[in-house]
Amino acid sequence: MATPAVMYLRRAFPEAEIAMISRRSTAGVWDGHPGIDRLIVGDDRTAARELREVVRSHRFEAAVLFPNSFRSAWFMWRCGIPRRFGYARGARSWLLTDIVVYRPQEWQTPTPQPVSKKSLRESKSLPREQPRHMVEYYLELASYVARQLGSDIAPPVVTRESALPPLVLPVQSQALEVVEKLITEEGVTSIPLIAIHPGAAYGNAKRWPLDRLAVAADRLADELGAAIVVTAGPSEAELCAELVRMLRARVLNWGPRLNIPQLVALLSRSTLFIGNDSGVTHLAAAVGCPTIAVFGPMDWNVTCPWSANAVVVRRSPPCAPCFLRECPLNHECMTAVTPDDVIAAARTLLSRQQGERNERA
C-alpha cells in the first residue's frame, strides 16, 4: 500500500537515488520496482550491525519511515542519516528530525472497549467520519517529505471510490514464465483459475473458516468451469492440505512453493482471487485481479484492498474491529460470513467487470 507514495517520491525527486530497505519476507514486492533504484534486504536481528554498515556506506541524506515501529526509527538513528521523516508514534519522536503529527481520529475506526456494555455503546456511538486509507497515510508522509526537501511537484489526487492513485506492482517476465510452465504441466491452460489463499500471518482471528471457503470455492469453480489454485505462506502448508481435502473441484495445491514474484504472476493470470485480510490479498488487488476479501477483526476502512476490482465481505458485530490475533469470544465477525455472501460478491464483481469489457469493445 506504500507503492503510490514511493512512486510520488520518484516523480518529486527524479535525480535522487531511492533505496528501499525491506524484510526478506517481503523483498520480492520491491525487486525490480520502478519506484526505487536499489533494494537493501535484511531483517535478521543478529545481522543488524552488518545492515547498518551497508546503509551507512551509501551516505543517504534522508530516510522516510513508512513503518510506525520504534525499532525502525532507532535503526535509522543508529545509521546516522541526517534527515529522518516519520509519524510521531510509539514514543519515537526524539529519534526523528522531521515529524508528521499522528491524528488517530483520521486513521482508525473507533475500537470497542469491552469493559462494560456502557463503554462499548459509547465507543461505537462517537460521531466520526470514515477513517482515511493507508494509501493516504503513506502519501501524506511522502507529501510532507517532498515539501520539506524542496520539491514543487504536487502529490496525486486521492479518489477512494476509484482507488486512485493505483498500487504499482509490475509482473516480472521471468516469474510469469515459471507460472505459465506450471499451468501447462497441470493441463489447465485453457480454463479460468480461481486463486485462494486461506491463511493470514497475523493470527487465526483473521481466517475465514475453511469449510465455508471450500463451499464457496467449489460452487464458483462449477459456475465458471474453473480450476482452483491454493497458495500459502511458508508455515501454512498443513492449512492448505486441510482445505484441499475439503474441495471437490479440480484443485492445484501449490502451497508455499511460489515466491512473491511468482505469486504476483499467478494472481495476474487468475480470473478471481478469494482470501482473508492478508498481504496476498493486497497483491491480488495491486495487479488488478478481481478480489474478494473476507474481513473480520481488523479495520476494513483503513486496510481494505485498494482496487476498483476488489470487494470486502464482512459482518460487523459490536466488538469489531478488535485487532486481536485470537478471538476470546465466538469469532462472530468471521463465522457470520456465509458462502452465499462470498458467492454473491464474486458474481457481482465478475458481472460488472464483464460489462466494462463489453463497453470498451
Predicted feature residues:
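Catalytic machinery of carbohydrate-active enzymes
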Residues: M1-A361
